[in-house]
């Protein structure tokens, strides 16, 4: 689960981290009141969406007067902001963050996340702050300094000081920077975060260090321990189809292609998407129905898939384990009775009760296209989608 910048900064404040003063605003009037409360000029008006690249997209602007705050707030609120992370459709701006401006000398990057290759947390720092870290990694990877964090030891002060030294921070700020790094790790662990990021952490012209932008992503599996964080969820920042999928415990992420996928297991789902790409197609979604899906959930998965007008074909790729193939077949038949399936459906099943599942589908009379392998299924899905164009 993602949260907005102003929510992440409020968490940072509670942990004693140096964050500029600022207030969220949900309408123009609140934006003006926030600027007046700050009482210093200029102020920064920031659109709040769950994506990076806001500055380049015009979502972060400097205001030098109340009139400018009103104008900028009116321009941003109620509109969609498109960045390189959102895609062309953008995300709705329903709130702003009004923050006191900071005189910047240097910008740095700091983040803690999970290194899946080592199954351990990792801290990344860079003197190339203010830029998108993906861009830095692609063009200047040596600019990113990383250190694996041993879970049984944690991030110690001497580790953090060494990282601050490598960043080239002034000696009088090494302890303060180290404290920021260790506190970030504390937040990462205590709040079950999957990523904590500061971009940028800035050295100000008066010789201080301040957090200018904050990002926290939380592990959904740990949210039951943090009801106060669950309340921060903003459903406007994800696709309505993703909101609907959550109601049925389906893992769904909308993509830009036209071949819908219905798969059990995240690994197989990603392999299926890769195979569709290799076959010349574009996946319309990631959809993991899980191992315990029943006929009702599968029917609801169909409804969600078919709600996407871009879908021209559906590729169902199931390896029957906990989710038996006959249960999948039952779900497909149930879905066909409840919704109008007006695009080609390609089915590839293997595993538990596969023969029974295939028999049920054959006897249903549904116009399904069958495949024996994932590659064959992907090729047939691409061919079927192209015919629908």
UniProtKB/Swiss-Prot annotation:
Pathway: Carbohydrate metabolism; tricarboxylic acid cycle; succinate from succinyl-CoA (ligase route): step 1/1
Pfam families: ATP-grasp_2, Ligase_CoA
InterPro entries (UniProt xref): ATP-grasp, ATP-grasp_succ-CoA_synth-type, ATP_grasp_subdomain_1, Succ-CoA_synthase_bsu_CS, SUCC_ACL_C, Succ_CoA_ligase-like_bsu, Succinyl-CoA_synth-like
ATP-grasp domain span: 9-244
EC category: ligase
Cofactor: Mg(2+)
EC numbers: 6.2.1.5
GO terms for MF: ATP binding; magnesium ion binding; succinate-CoA ligase (ADP-forming) activity; succinate-CoA ligase (GDP-forming) activity
Cofactor note: Binds 1 Mg(2+) ion per subunit.
Protein name: Succinate--CoA ligase [ADP-forming] subunit beta
């Amino acid at each position: 689960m993602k949260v907005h910048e102003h929510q992440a900064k409020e968490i940072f404040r509670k942990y004693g981290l140096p964050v500029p003063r600022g207030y969220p605003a949900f309408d123009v009037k609140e934006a003006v009141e926030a600027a007046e409360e700050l009482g210093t000029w200029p102020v920064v008006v920031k659109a709040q969406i769950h994506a990076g690249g806001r500055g380049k997209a015009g979502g972060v602007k400097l205001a030098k007067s109340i009139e400018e705050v009103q104008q900028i707030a009116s321009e941003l609120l109620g509109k969609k902001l498109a960045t390189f992370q959102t895609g062309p459709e953008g995300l709705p701006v329903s709130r702003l963050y009004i923050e006191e401006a900071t005189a910047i000398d240097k910008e740095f990057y700091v983040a803690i996340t999970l290194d899946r290759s080592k199954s351990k947390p990792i801290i990344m720092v860079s003197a190339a702050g203010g830029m998108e870290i993906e861009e830095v990694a692609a063009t200047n990877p040596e600019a990113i300094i990383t250190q694996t964090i041993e879970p049984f030891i944690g991030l110690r002060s001497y580790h953090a000081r060494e990282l601050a030294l490598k960043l080239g921070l002034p000696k009088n700020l090494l302890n303060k920077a180290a404290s920021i790094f260790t506190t970030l790790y504390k937040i990462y662990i205590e709040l079950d975060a999957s990523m904590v990021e500061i971009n940028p952490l800035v050295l100000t012209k008066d010789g201080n260090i301040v957090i200018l932008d904050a990002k926290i992503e939380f592990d959904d599996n740990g949210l039951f321990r943090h009801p106060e964080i669950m309340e921060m969820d903003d459903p406007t920042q994800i696709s309505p189809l993703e909101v609907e999928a959550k109601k049925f415990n389906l893992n769904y992420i909308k993509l830009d292609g036209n071949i819908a996928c219905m798969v059990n297991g995240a690994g197989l789902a990603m392999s299926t998407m890769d195979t569709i790409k290799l076959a010349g197609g574009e996946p319309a979604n990631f959809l993991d129905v899980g191992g315990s899906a029943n006929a009702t959930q599968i029917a609801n998965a169909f409804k969600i898939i078919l709600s996407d007008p871009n879908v021209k074909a559906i590729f169902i790729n199931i390896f029957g384990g906990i989710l038996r193939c006959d249960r999948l077949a039952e779900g497909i038949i149930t879905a066909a009775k409840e919704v109008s399936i007006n695009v080609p459906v390609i089915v590839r099943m293997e595993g538990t009760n596969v023969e029974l599942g295939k028999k049920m589908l054959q006897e249903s009379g549904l116009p399904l296209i069958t495949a024996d392998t994932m590659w064959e299924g992907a090729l047939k899905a691409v061919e079927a989608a192209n015919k629908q164009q």
